[in-house]
Structure formats: structure tokens, C-alpha cells
Amino acid sequence: MDSQRELAEELRLYQSTLLQDGLKDLLDEKKFIDCTLKAGDKSLPCHRLILSACSPYFREYFLSEIDEAKKKEVVLDNVDPAILDLIIKYLYSASIDLNDGNVQDIFALASRFQIPSVFTVCVSYLQKRLAPGNCLAILRLGLLLDCPRLAISAREFVSDRFVQICKEEDFMQLSPQELISVISNDSLNVEKEEAVFEAVMKWVRTDKENRVKNLSEVFDCIRFRLMTEKYFKDHVEKDDIIKSNPDLQKKIKVLKDAFAGKLPEPSKNAAKTGAGEVNGDVGDEDLLPGYLNDIPRHGMFVKDLILLVNDTAAVAYDPTENECYLTALAEQIPRNHSSIVTQQNQIYVVGGLYVDEENKDQPLQSYFFQLDSIASEWVGLPPLPSARCLFGLGEVDDKIYVVAGKDLQTEASLDSVLCYDPVAAKWNEVKKLPIKVYGHNVISHKGMIYCLGGKTDDKKCTNRVFIFNPKKGDWKDLAPMKIPRSMFGVAVHKGKIVIAGGVTEDGLSASVEAFDLTTNKWDVMTEFPQERSSISLVSLAGSLYAIGGFAMIQLESKEFAPTEVNDIWKYEDDKKEWAGMLKEIRYASGASCLATRLNLFKLSKL
């Protein structure tokens, strides 16, 4: 049966190709031409049969009782001849040159003349090119041309990135109905409903005189019961526009009662008045007014998780529930990378080596990726200007800092510091570190970058600690660590910089120290249960975790060798001791570890 189907498909493709090529030849040679489409001062010869087969509009036109002369020359008003020419050629060749400059005009004309093949091609093109800068325009186009497939795709794109897109100027130009189509969506990616309210009120104030009259309808799409009662009292009740609107004051009264636990009786008439229609997926049993809707948005399922990134996948671990979730596949991520999460919860991976054959001057490059947690994929960014390893990563104001390390070509120790600006999408060099160092660690806290330990040019461990102020552009010494070390774990936990394990002049270490940022002093903490290097420390939701690393393990031959371990420990602050949580989590193998916030709604449980 399979061979018969394959043969039938092969014959169909052959016949389709033969027919398409034959039709194009007939058009090129102007054979059997029986009509002309006239747009402006240009006449385009074609065949009624082809137009009728591809367009219900033209089929009805040519089968109508219209005078024969009008069928021979069809005059099309308000049509760009260049766009029409592209569409006609597509009907004969199945090829069209779509670009950002012509796709909307082609889309509109295909919609007007009911040419589904061109229409579908345009929709697919626009869906693939959805971006923060054009998604609202594409949403508007989908609604205007009554194309649910495109409008829904654009709306979902906007919903996923609502916090970013609601700040754009295009958002402020949305019509009331366009705004409602966005904020009524259950899938809105907001952690707090307060963000929706603030976006709506900013939209109103952009054109207050005209938009106040639409506010009552838009108001129904905001899910006030998802807000804190304090925020509702301080910001919603006291808003001057809301206070001056009698209709909204009635709704405020109902909402105040709802916060007090008194809901109105559901009414079948609510749906008829439109008050319940904006809630999206509500049924007949949910006929309370829209502004009483308390269904959580999809973005409200965000949780603090430990992200483990290796060369296979990025996996999020929930230590409270002992569950793992697939965040993204990571086959392009190298093993020897470093990772960082910014204050804005943006996740970056830096490092690893590849050869850029087109760059003759500097063929060796280091990878640089950013995680798109919505699309669950890694986005390539401009590589490091100089390939290096054993460096430290810091972040201030969304800028990424790569501090010192080793040059991958010369193996020389480095003191240079590179800064990546995501707005300009460029790397720049900033103030050098006072010493050349590698195998150190870097941590950021409250707008400052701290560089700790590592090995210097003489291959000896250092205990020096530096602080970098990006606004002043200078490095300063802080109190040194008690034990010089490299390849250790670091985290900011409860206002202190905690370091654990690492390599010292005597070998692997289990010692743990804490640096008090207010007193500039180091204190000894409870030792980790095992001497380790490359251990990862993560402070998550008030708890400190230690993950993996390398320990000296006795082999069957009775010899000791550095071996990777993939366990998880938790520091119990009240008992001042380390407690084992997981003996092995395989996703930690070769992984960098981060404390981050991710939306469980969009993740797949492993």
C-alpha cells in the first residue's frame, strides 16, 4: 500500500509541475489569452479559466451576466499594478517574491479578490516574522482583514510578551476593541494583574478625551480580584479618572464587596449586556461581570526554580516539589560554558569555542547565547571579541560583564573586562582588573560586581577580592578571603557573599566563608561535607543550595581520581549544617546552575 501511495503522490506532483510549467509558457507566449486585467495604466493579459480556478471572486464575475466586453477587459479600481502583477505571476508559477515591504499590500489584495493560495502564503510569512516591533501592526491587519489565524497568532505573541510590548508606542495607538482583544486573553503573560491595570490607564491617558468614554468596556477585562486588596485601594480606588466616572464607581462598589467576600448573584442577563463576554473561555455558569473574573492568567504560574544548563538541555528543578521540567533543548550549548541570570530574569550562556572560517584575522570565537524562555530556544548573539575560558560573569543594568580569564589561543592570563550592551548589541572593553587572573569567580549585587580569588600568572591561588562600580568605572580592593582558592562556588545569600569549596594550594577544599558586605569582613561557615572543586552555589527563595562539582573518589584500582558528582545539598540556616537532598540528579552533569523564575504553565514535566 505504501508503494502505491508513493507512486500516486509522485504522479500527482509530476502532473502538477507539468501543468504549472505549461500554464506559465502559455502566459509568456500570450497564447489563448481571453481577458485582460487593467490596473491604473497597466494591462495584464491572462486566462479566465486560471483566474476562475484560483479565485471565487473572479469565478463569480466571469459566470455572471456582465457584458462580454467587460469580461475581456476587467477594470480594477484602487489596485497597485505592480502588486497585481506579482499575484498573477504567482497563479501561473507558484512563485512570489514576498518581503517586508510588499507583504501587506499583497495580503490585502489577495483578501479583496479571494485568492486563498496567496492569502495563505502571506499569513505564513507574517507569522514567521512576528517580532515585538511589528506584532501589534500584524494583529491589527489580521483583525482588519478578518483573518482569525493571523490575528490569533499575533495576539498570542503579544500576550506572551505583554510586559515588554505594553511599553511600546504602538500599544498606545490600539483601538478600544484591539486593546480588549489583547487584555481579555487568559494566556496573558503577566505575573501580576496590576501590570494590566497600569497599561490600560496609561493607554487611557494617552488620549484621555476620546478614550474615557470607552474605559467602562475596557475596565471589564481587568481581573481586579487577582490584585492585592491594598493595591486596589491605593491605586484603583484613588485613580482620578476612575473617581470621576459614575459608571465605574458602581463597579468599584461591587469590587469592594467582592474583596469583602460578597459576590453578586450570577445573572443570565450579564452575557447579553456584554459585561461577561470579555472573559474569553467562560461558560453559561460563569455569568458574573467580567471585572469580577478571577481566573489566573497563564503568566501567574511563575515559580523560583534552579536551572541546570548543559550541552543536552536546560532543565529546571523545583527543590520544594522535587520535580524537573524541560525548559529548552541545548544541543548547541558547549560543555565548557558559563551562565548568568540578570535582574530582569534574562538568561545568558557565554563561552565554548568554535572556528569562524570566514574571519581570517580571528578564526577562534566564543559562543554567546540568550534563552528565549517563551519559544524554548537559544538565540545566538554577537560572539566574544576574544575567545577565552575560565572567566567570570557579572551583570549590572542588563549589561553583561566578562571578567579576566585565559586566552584560548595563547593561554595567557587576562586582566581585560568586556561589557555587552544588549541595546546596542555590541561588546566594549571597560576598566581592566588590577591583576591577571583565571579560575576566579564573579558575582553581582545591588549594582556592583565582585571578583573573588582565582589563580594568577604564577599559577598560585589568590585570596584578593575586588569590587567594580560600573558608574564610576573603577576597581577597588576589599577584605581578602581567609583562604586563597580557585574553581569554587559563589552566591549572594541573605545579603552576604558565600563561597564554598574550590582548589587551594593544598588541594581540594570543603571550607565555606561568608563576606558581610556592610562590615567588609569574612566569617567562617560550616564546612561542606566533602572537599570539592567547581561546586555550584545557588540562593533560591531564601534557601542556599550546593550542586555537583568534582571530588576525589576512590576507584576500583584503589587510586583516587577527580570525579564529577551530581548531588544536591541544602544549607539549613537554623541548624547551621548541610543536609543532603538528592544523591544524584543526572541533569546536573556538566551543567552550570542558576536561580531563576520560570513559568510552569509553559514547561513540560520530566
UniProtKB/Swiss-Prot annotation:
Any one Gene Ontology cellular component term annotated for this protein: pseudopodium
PTM comment, free text: Ubiquitinated by E3 ubiquitin ligase complex formed by CUL3 and RBX1 and probably targeted for proteasome-independent degradation. Quinone-induced oxidative stress increases its ubiquitination.
Kelch repeats: 346-398, 399-447, 448-495, 497-542, 544-599
Lineage top rank: taxon: Eukaryota
Any one GO BP annotation for this protein: myofibril assembly
A molecular function (GO) term: ubiquitin-like ligase-substrate adaptor activity
Main localization (coarse): cytoplasm
Domain BTB, chain residue ranges per copy: 33-100
Modified residues (Phosphoserine): 3
Cellular compartment(s): Cytoplasm; Cytoplasm, Cytoskeleton; Cell projection, Pseudopodium; Cell projection, Ruffle
Gene3D superfamilies assigned to the protein according to its UniProt record, in alphabetical order: 1.25.40.420, Kelch-type beta propeller, Potassium Channel Kv1.1, Chain A
InterPro entries reported for this sequence: BACK, BTB-kelch_protein, BTB/POZ_dom, Kelch-typ_b-propeller, Kelch_1, KLHL41_KL41B_BTB_POZ_dom, SKP1/BTB/POZ_sf
Tissue expression per record: Sarcomeric muscle.
Limits of the BACK domain: 135-237
Keyword list, A-Z: Cell projection, Cytoplasm, Cytoskeleton, Disease variant, Endoplasmic reticulum, Kelch repeat, Membrane, Nemaline myopathy, Phosphoprotein, Repeat, Sarcoplasmic reticulum, Ubl conjugation
One Pfam family hit: BTB
Known role: Involved in skeletal muscle development and differentiation. Regulates proliferation and differentiation of myoblasts and plays a role in myofibril assembly by promoting lateral fusion of adjacent thin fibrils into mature, wide myofibrils. Required for pseudopod elongation in transformed cells.
Subunit structure: Interacts with NRAP. Interacts with LASP1. Part of a complex that contains CUL3, RBX1 and KLHL41.
Pathology noted in the entry: Nemaline myopathy 9: An autosomal recessive form of nemaline myopathy. Nemaline myopathies are muscular disorders characterized by muscle weakness of varying severity and onset, and abnormal thread-like or rod-shaped structures in muscle fibers on histologic examination. NEM9 phenotype is highly variable, ranging from death in infancy due to lack of antigravity movements, to slowly progressive distal muscle weakness with preserved ambulation later in childhood.
Protein name: Kelch-like protein 41
The encoding gene: KLHL41
